[in-house]
From Swiss-Prot:
Perinuclear space side of membrane: 56-58, 128-153, 204-256
Cytoplasmic side stretches: 1-34, 80-106, 175-182, 278-601
One Pfam family it belongs to: Ndc1_Nup
Organism: Schizosaccharomyces pombe (strain 972 / ATCC 24843) (Fission yeast)
Keywords: Cytoplasm, Cytoskeleton, Membrane, mRNA transport, Nuclear pore complex, Nucleus, Protein transport, Translocation, Transmembrane, Transmembrane helix, Transport
GO molecular function: spindle pole body-nuclear membrane anchor activity
Protein name stated in the entry: Nuclear envelope protein ndc1
Membrane topology: Multi-pass membrane protein
Subcellular location(s) per record: Nucleus, Nuclear pore complex; Nucleus membrane; Cytoplasm, Cytoskeleton, Microtubule organizing center, Spindle pole body
One annotated Gene Ontology cellular component of this protein: nuclear pore transmembrane ring
Disulfide bond sites: none
Similarity-based family: Belongs to the NDC1 family.
Cytoplasm keyword on record: yes
GO biological process: one example: spindle pole body localization
């Protein structure tokens, strides 16, 4: 008797479009819009840098032309930002190691040359626009029968522009302006500017004041050298009266105010340009009111592909934010995610495995650091999830992925009585018996008297604890930031999966989520407990309790996301706990956290 098949495989599903393939042209369009906004900013800056009748049409036209020239020299700044853009900050264990990393020659010279090109153009336009009003000409007007001379006021403003270039470079590298505090921004440009306008003005004002106060003192120390170099350089281009001694002191209150105004406008211009770059390039997944993956022939497959793109962090962040939008606002996509099971691995299983891997990666890093204290092993990429051991053998499989027992490099089948003597083997290799002279294994403590040795160690430790060497000491805050460099991505992933679980009661018709709720709660509880135990073990030895929130800022945000997920799922599914096949430990832990939350609220 032949049995007929009652189920047939579905038709061949077309391969989903890569998420980055859809995102790349969108990023190019956003970069062009950011360049247009930068052009408008350069025109406004050139208008404020010029001096003349503000109502004149010729003055406006000249400002527009200068704005195009400023944009030509400001464009390398955008190119530098795009080449160095990142979604997470690289954090070292100590400030000294952080400075060595941030101010490496490759990074420093690239950023310095970029600012030198852009800032020099803006400062020269300001000096040229106010040359007649405050006597900032390069060459001073000579008297009758005298050669022209170099104008020291011009030399001072040029030196001030170089100080401004150095200040902007140091600020950009030290504060890591290439990676924003929030990796992805989903607000309009004008709203974002208005939200940060007060901070922009205050920050630019403080930086301008610091430059204006520092420059006169440094110029007074280096005045003779700067004057000789400027006079020698000018004499190569123009015929001037060359003198090695500078004239009278050029600085006045009016020149100081002009230098402050120039620095303030330049700093404000670069801060707004940075916000322009962020608000366009780090924008969210909404394109004309439509999500990015909706343009694909397989929206769910494209979304999962974007969330699994590890080599392109910006693509991963935007795809994760799109999942958050779907979980909060799009019931139709939620239904399609729950019903998309016609695959080798369903979409829900893909989303769950992504969240599980990120939770286990964090928990594994914390366990390694807590047990061994090896920070490099905890933060390395190999300290994440271990490979699965239940890999079936096949002739074409990679043998390196199969866990094997390493064997010693000798014949293990020879009986012990037939083995060779280690002493005879050494005689064969060395040709003589090994020396029986005892080796001094005590080290330097046996050569130097113990009292002197203790004094030296005490002096070195006291000298190392001095405030001067504070930048080389490892701090708890930097360690925690390096363990979770992108807390935003972790929190959004956990919150998105939690929202999908909460809405599964309404939209999950096949029951694909109910089977994994116990596993989700187990992952959440285990990761949360590891975070809590790690924090408690460090708080005991923490000397300053006032900085605990700052030191554990990233880990606290991750713990809050996990805690809220446990509380929300427990509250929503408390009537079905007996049907979820929860382990007694996880069920007890969920109820404890839920009751603590209710009692505190």
């Amino acid at each position: 008797m032949v049995m007929l098949r009652t189920s047939f495989p579905s038709g061949s599903r077309t391969k989903a479009v890569r998420y980055h393939t859809l995102l790349r042209p969108i990023l190019q369009q956003r970069f062009l819009r950011a360049c247009f906004a930068l052009l408008c900013l350069c025109c406004i800056t050139s208008y404020w840098f010029s001096s003349g009748p503000f109502i004149s049409l010729s003055f406006w036209f000249l400002s527009l032309v200068r704005g195009f020239v400023c944009f030509f020299f400001m464009f390398p700044y955008f190119v530098m930002l795009k080449s160095r853009m990142s979604t997470q900050k690289v954090t070292k264990q100590s400030l000294g190691a952080q400075l060595f990393y941030d101010f490496s020659p490759k990074s420093f010279f690239l950023v310095y040359l970029t600012f030198a090109v852009s800032v020099s153009c803006l400062c020269l336009f300001y000096i040229k626009g106010h040359a007649s009003s405050i006597r900032l000409q390069w060459i001073a007007s000579p008297n009758a029968y005298e050669l022209p001379s170099l104008n020291e006021r011009f030399v001072y403003m040029t030196y001030f522009s170089h100080i401004l270039i150095l200040a902007l470079t140091v600020e950009h590298l030290y504060l890591q302006r290439d990676s924003p505090s929030r990796p992805v921004i989903n607000v309009s440009f004008f709203n974002y500017i208005f939200q940060n306008l007060g901070w922009l003005i205050r920050f630019s004002f403080r930086k301008s004041i610091i430059c204006c106060l520092f420059t006169p003192f440094s110029y007074a120390i280096l005045r003779s050298y700067i004057w000789r170099f400027a006079a020698l350089l000018t004499s190569c281009c123009r015929r001037i009266a060359y003198t090695k001694t500078p004239p009278k002191w050029p600085l006045s209150l009016r020149l100081l105010l002009h230098s402050f105004w120039m620095a303030f406008i330049v700093c404000l211009t670069f801060q707004i340009a940075l916000l322009i770059f962020r608000v366009f390039l780090y924008s969210g997944p909404m394109i004309r009111g439509k999500l990015l993956s909706a343009r694909s022939n397989d929206p769910n497959g494209t979304l999962v592909d974007g969330m699994k793109t590890k080599k392109k962090p910006l693509t991963e962040c935007i795809a994760t934010e799109e999942l958050w939008f779907i979980a909060k606002r799009d019931p139709q996509r939620i239904k399609s995610i729950f019903q998309d099971i016609d695959r080798s691995v369903s979409i829900w299983q893909e989303l769950y495995s992504i969240t599980e891997s990120r939770c286990k990666e964090l928990a594994t890093s914390l366990k390694i650091l807590q047990s061994t204290g090896d920070f490099s092993a905890a933060t390395s990429k190999k300290s994440g999830l271990t490979k699965k051991t239940n890999i079936p053998y096949s002739p074409n499989s990679n043998h390196e992925e199969i866990n094997s027992i390493p064997l010693r490099n000798k014949n293990i089948f020879v009986p012990p009585s037939q083995g060779h003597s280690p002493l005879l083997e050494k005689i064969k290799k060395q040709g003589s018996l090994p020396s029986t002279t005892p080796v001094n294994e005590g080290g330097i403590s046996d050569i130097i008297p113990k009292s002197l040795y203790d004094q030296v160690i005490r002096f070195i430790s006291t000298f190392y604890k001095a405030p001067v060497f504070g930048i080389f000491r490892k701090t708890l805050r930097r360690q925690n930031e390096a363990l979770l460099p992108n807390p935003w991505l972790f929190c959004v992933t956990v919150n998105s999966l939690t929202q999908l679980v909460l809405k599964s009661l309404k939209y999950d018709t096949y029951g694909v989520v109910a089977r994994d709720i116990s596993s989700i709660l187990a992952v959440y509880c285990d990761t949360f407990d590891v975070l809590v135990s790690y924090k408690r073990s460090l708080v005991k030895n923490h000397s300053n309790s006032t900085n605990l929130d700052d030191d554990f800022k990233n880990l606290n945000s991750a713990a809050n996301a996990l805690h809220c997920g446990i509380i929300d799922i427990t509250e929503k599914f408390q009537d079905f706990f007996t049907q979820l096949n929860l382990s007694p430990r996880i069920e007890r832990r969920c109820w404890v956290l839920f009751r603590e939350y209710k009692s505190n609220s």
